[in-house]
Amino acid sequence: MTILCWLALLSTLTAVNAANILAVFPTPAYSHHIVYKVYIEALAEKCHNVTVVKPKLFAYSTKTYCGNITEINADMSVEQYKKLVANSAMFRKRGVVSDTDTVTAANYLGLIEMFKDQFDNINVRNLIANNQTFDLVVVEAFADYALVFGHLYDPAPVIQIAPGYGLAENFDTVGAVARHPVHHPNIWRSNFDDTEANVMTEMRLYKEFKILANMSNALLKQQFGPNTPTIEKLRNKVQLLLLNLHPIFDNNRPVPPSVQYLGGGIHLVKSAPLTKLSPVINAQMNKSKSGTIYVSFGSSIDTKSFANEFLYMLINTFKTLDNYTILWKIDDEVVKNITLPANVITQNWFNQRAVLRHKKMAAFITQGGLQSSDEALEAGIPMVCLPMMGDQFYHAHKLQQLGVARALDTVTVSSDQLLVAINDVLFNAPTYKKHMAELYALINHDKATFPPLDKAIKFTERVIRYRHDISRQLYSLKTTAANVPYSNYYMYKSVFSIVMNHLTHF
């Protein structure tokens, strides 16, 4: 009997310690995959075997782990990429800005079609045809289309992971507070005033993503067969949402245990040791008169798409700051025929962490991406944010609220307005740095208490351990309101009945 008990215990431990996991991360964004890579490597270090469906950006499996990492190249076709870029160029403002007005189902359909093409890739089709079994499916939260893999590998439960903020639809899926025009605004918004117009914007965004889900349903049935469940039904399999974010940035949203805020900065947890700057850049920074201003709009922004007037607005601003050395990450092709001010140094790439930690660094002009702001907080460098897409608008707004940055409207900002914001963070640097130190200390305190990567792995393994009984309320992390239509959640029929009964008495 004792031997049987030990065998049962060993079987249970093995089920968790050597799980077969499928991860599906189709969005070809470098800033997303530097987060996913760390998470996947941590799973492999815990002896899990992970198969990753991803674009060919960079390799995940760079070391030898207790578990295996198998990469399935799901690169989109060159033609599809060109089509996506061409279509998006038609609605971007100033060449690069995709604000709330541009967030429509029609504009985002190209992204869903890109996912479809990736899953039609011969490598992915071969994976599906192999009839391999998995104990867990992990998909990126931004790509609901990828939830179909939870259906293909049923009964494996599903986890969604985001490199930063979650979508309102993600919170709906797991039963968290998803929407409020003021306290929990949709991350696709670019204006955060307490106005009736923004209430209408929230309603429009809800409708657009409903339309996009219906478009996705049609493509799913076309690709995987007429019996493929809808997005709404596929969401029922999601048991956990992991967010690479500290809850303070999300207004301390009330959430059930099915949402775990990891604290942010996961890409820094196992980053390579800080390397030295090139001697040339180091020398340029050391001899700067008043300091150095670093300008980078991240890895997802194509600087070749800058509208000319926006490009020259930036150049004219930098020219005015002639006491400062400007390090500007921009494609060489953009500026090769432009005579730049003497204080401006451009490159395709800079060692961002090393630049930000240099003793002469004074300010950081950024798109407001989460990974960039993590590195700015780490270095204590005040930011001026020019958000251009996605959650950058909300994050920039939140950074300004917390007193560590200035946020500007990239669609309308002028050289004078940008200069005022830059001078503000330069001349009031002690105040900004104080706020940054306080925020960084708070975040680090919580990370020391709940290490981000440990938290992600432990909750992942909890879902794996109880995968056979996940439908039982005893084991579920979700609330009973998870994925419930708003008409049912707000009990419209009951409310209507009460109102009608009340009216009949008059």
Curated annotation (Swiss-Prot):
Xref: CDD domains: GT1_Gtf-like
Record keywords: Glycoprotein, Glycosyltransferase, Signal, Transferase
**What EC number is given for this enzyme?**
2.4.1.-
Q: What class of enzyme is it?
A: transferase
* InterPro entries tied to this protein: Ecdysteroid_UDP-Glc_Trfase (IPR016224), UDP-glycosyltransferase (IPR050271), UDP_glucos_trans (IPR002213), UDP_glycos_trans_CS (IPR035595)
Q: Does the keyword Zinc apply?
A: no
- This protein's source sits in the domain of life called Viruses
Q: Which residues form the signal peptide?
A: 1-18
Q: Known post-translational modifications?
A: Glycosylated.
Keyword field contains Transferase = yes
Sample GO molecular function, one term: UDP-glycosyltransferase activity
Q: Any idea what job this protein has?
A: Catalyzes the transfer of glucose from UDP-glucose to ecdysteroids which are insect molting hormones. Acts on the host at the organismal level to block its development, thereby increasing the yield of progeny virus.
Task: State the family it belongs to.
Answer: Belongs to the UDP-glycosyltransferase family.
Name of this chain's protein: Ecdysteroid UDP-glucosyltransferase
What is the native source organism of this protein?
A: Autographa californica nuclear polyhedrosis virus (AcMNPV)
Q: What is the lineage of its organism?
A: Viruses, Viruses incertae sedis, Naldaviricetes, Lefavirales, Baculoviridae
